[in-house]
Regions:
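Core beta-strand-centered patch of the WYL/Sm-like small regulatory domain
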Residues: 2-109
Length: 109
């Protein structure tokens, strides 16, 4: 029995909790995303993520984008870990009362 999640929502939630990138398609592009938070907006599920690569190319600059989960085709976990981006602001108003799961900074010993 596989321990990997199946379906878009469980896959994205696992990626956020484990801080692992996902491969997916978005607007016909093949993307590698580092999802930081899943939340609801107007009754729809969104993830905010950093694009690590688009169609095999590195982005010119780091950007935190919002992606409607229904628009992400076949998200799959990769073994690639990511660091929490400085662009992610967990206290941002758009996440207030709507966050379902978010990355957590590692505890400092």
């Amino acid at each position: 029995m596989s321990e990997e999640p199946t379906g878009p929502v469980p896959t994205l939630f696992a990626a956020i909790v484990r801080q692992l990138c996902v491969n997916a398609t978005y607007n016909r592009d093949k993307v590698v995303l580092a999802p930081h938070v899943a939340y609801t907006k107007h009754g729809e599920l969104y993830v905010d993520a950093i694009i690590v690569a688009r169609n095999g190319m590195l982005p010119r600059e780091e950007k935190l984008g919002s992606y409607k989960v229904t628009g992400l085709g076949e998200p799959r976990l990769t073994g690639r870990a990511f660091e929490i981006s400085r662009l992610y602001e967990p206290e941002a108003e758009r996440y207030a009362g709507s966050t379902l799961v978010a990355v957590e900074p590692a505890a400092v010993a």
